Amino acid sequence: MSMTDLLHAEDIKKAVGAFTAVDSFDHKKFFQMVGLKKKSPEDVKKVFHILDKDKSGFIEEEELGFILKGFSPDARDLSVKETKTLLAAGDKDGDGKIGADEFSTLVAES
């Protein structure tokens, strides 16, 4: 399954394009722009599993740095600051990674 099976390619392109500048990433705006906020909980979990590159059941800090690439392969990497901000927003239990339920909450709060 690919991201475009769940989200519109044009929405992905616009959302990724809106955050090309370093340190401009805002996960709340991004999730809204890409259309993820409007998706069912099941679809949000499918997106989570696409972003969980090592299939560990979590999106670790290293994977978060590549989150935009999960939506569009030619997108930029997040900066260290952006990655840490995203991790802090999503890691509700403080274990240093984001699980599927935490990701769903992060999207719902966007």
Swiss-Prot record:
Q: Which UniProt keywords apply?
A: Acetylation, Calcium, Metal-binding, Muscle protein, Phosphoprotein, Repeat
What would be one Gene Ontology cellular-component term for the protein?
cytoplasm
All copies of the EF-hand domain together span 39-74, 78-110
Where does the secretion signal sit in this chain?
none
Modification Phosphoserine, positions: 2, 24
N-acetylserine: residues bearing it: 2
GO molecular function, one example?
calcium ion binding
Gene3D superfamilies attached here? EF-hand
Which Pfam families does the annotation name?
EF-hand_7 (PF13499)
Supply the SUPFAM superfamilies for this chain: EF-hand (SSF47473)
| PANTHER family per UniProt | PARVALBUMIN ALPHA
Q: Which family does it belong to?
A: Belongs to the parvalbumin family.
Record function comment: In muscle, parvalbumin is thought to be involved in relaxation after contraction. It binds two calcium ions.
Q: What is this protein called?
A: Parvalbumin alpha
The source organism is: Bos taurus (Bovine)
